[in-house]
């Protein structure tokens, strides 16, 4: 009896391994943000080209946005703007200008709440509200998510993933929100030891000195050989994994 039971267990185990193998065939698309059992956001991207991305968070004010968009246009640079649902509702024309300028739009939640403090259903609601608001205005589907305050845990990232989002933070923080001045913003970014191919640079559209620092920041990055591209042209949408620093690496490397 015990022998038959052992045999049955072995057969069942082999069958499970076989079925599992069907879903892990070589060449299958895989996407993993899990590193040593913890879900991580994308911080930067492994790339042979010297590319980087400027990303802006839009949650409160919009007074500098027009100037920022003009500066980007003057320098022929496309960036990414992470917007909250409240901001979208308050400044719909700015959302349209962002999209018309060829920039990427990202989800920054609906109300800029700390996602870690929310239940899964509340996180889903925050994401859906912003997604729907942007889609109704522009017809665009959002693919990227940045949690407010840089606060995340496994639930936040997995919930975003279930909604079709890549969670993106950034390995270079300009600290422009501290309002120390344009020169400090420039120095903070350009002297960061993590600045490299595939860097994602974080800025705030409403910070006091961001628009003043932006022209010199773009020129300094380009002088160092960086090509500034939209987020959608840098990130891998599939077949990738992350290292311990959140660097996105294609599975064939």
Enumerate the language-model features and the residues they cover:
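Alpha-helical scaffold elements lining the catalytic groove of polysaccharide deacetylases
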Residues: 62-64, 113-141, 151-197, 210-213
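Structural recognition of the beta-strand scaffold that forms the well-ordered cores
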Residues: 53-55, 79-83, 104-107, 143-146, ...
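Active-site beta-loop-alpha junctions enriched in small/polar residues
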Residues: 59, 84-86, 110, 150, ...
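C-terminal domain-boundary segment and adjacent tail
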Residues: 26-28, 36-48, 74-76, 87-89, ...
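Active-site beta->alpha N-cap acidic-glycine motif
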Residues: 30-114, 118, 122-126, 131-133, ...
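N-terminal Lys/Arg-rich, disordered targeting/topogenic segments
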Residues: 1-6
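Short low-complexity, flexible loop/linker segments enriched in glycine and/or proline
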Residues: 95-97, 121-123, 183-186, 242-247
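Hydrophobic membrane-insertion alpha-helices, especially the h-region
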Residues: 8-25
């Amino acid at each position: 009896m015990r022998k038959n039971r052992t045999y049955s267990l072995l057969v069942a185990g082999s069958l499970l391994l076989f079925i599992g193998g069907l879903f892990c065939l070589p060449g299958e698309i895989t996407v993993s943000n899990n590193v040593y059992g913890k879900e991580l956001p994308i911080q930067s991207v492994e790339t042979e080209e010297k590319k980087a991305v400027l990303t802006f968070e839009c949650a409160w004010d919009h007074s500098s946005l027009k100037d920022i968009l003009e500066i980007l246009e003057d320098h022929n640079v496309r960036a990414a703007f992470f917007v909250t649902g409240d901001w979208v509702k308050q400044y719909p024309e700015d959302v349209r200008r962002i999209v018309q300028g060829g920039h990427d739009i990202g989800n920054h939640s609906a109300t800029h709440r700390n996602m870690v403090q929310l239940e899964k259903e509340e996180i889903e609601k925050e994401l859906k509200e912003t997604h729907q608001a942007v889609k109704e205005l522009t017809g665009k589907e959002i693919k990227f998510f940045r949690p407010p305050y840089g606060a995340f845990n496994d639930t936040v990232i997995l919930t975003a993933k279930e909604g079709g989002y890549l969670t993106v933070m950034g390995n270079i923080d300009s600290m422009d929100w501290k309002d120390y001045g344009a020169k400090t913003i420039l120095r903070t970014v350009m002297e960061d030891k993590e600045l490299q191919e595939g860097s994602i640079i974080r800025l705030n559209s409403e910070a006091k000195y961001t628009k003043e620092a932006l022209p010199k920041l773009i020129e300094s990055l380009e002088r160092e050989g960086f090509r500034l591209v939209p987020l959608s042209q840098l990130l891998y949408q599939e077949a990738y994994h992350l290292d311990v620093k959140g660097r996105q690496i294609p599975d064939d490397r």
